[in-house]
Amino acid sequence: EYSMYEEMCKCSELFTKFGGHPMAAGLSLPQENVEPFRQKINEYASLTDDDLVPKIHIDVPMPVDYVSMRLVSEFSVLAPFGKDNPKPVFADKNLRVSRMWIVGKNNNVLRLSLISSYGTPINAIYFGDIESFFDYIRQRFGTDALEAAQRGRFNNIVLSVVYSPKINVFRENESLQFEIQYYK
């Protein structure tokens, strides 16, 4: 694992102050040391192209059809979730997009209606970069498919997703919702 802090220690003579830990670091340095720092940190870096590809870890491949409100409720015994105790993450494939639309006060959330390979309707939500998602859909399935999905019309979009199931509460109604973290 790459540690930004350890790499910065190798250049410490260039800083007026610095600190951090393996996941993050901060520094102050004079303007004239910016370029020498850039050169040294890149020279010392042991990162490979493979290190720059995000690694996606799931707990288990699990069809969305297997997830129930009861199962999601039982996950609460694993809480609290955070960096050292991540929430359970699963994967499923062959999910057909029947509709997608942007919601949220800032138009920054994508809701999707999906159909599982068993024909089960699924409510999903995506909090990531919507434009990148749309670009992926356009590139893989075409602009017509994207526009059809945005209108709730038949299309050829089929996704594999990494997701976390949740219980959504809206106006006192509870429903199962799948938060998409990664897609392909």
Predicted regions, residues:
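Acidic, two-metal ion nucleic-acid-processing modules in DNA metabolism proteins
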Residues: E1-K184
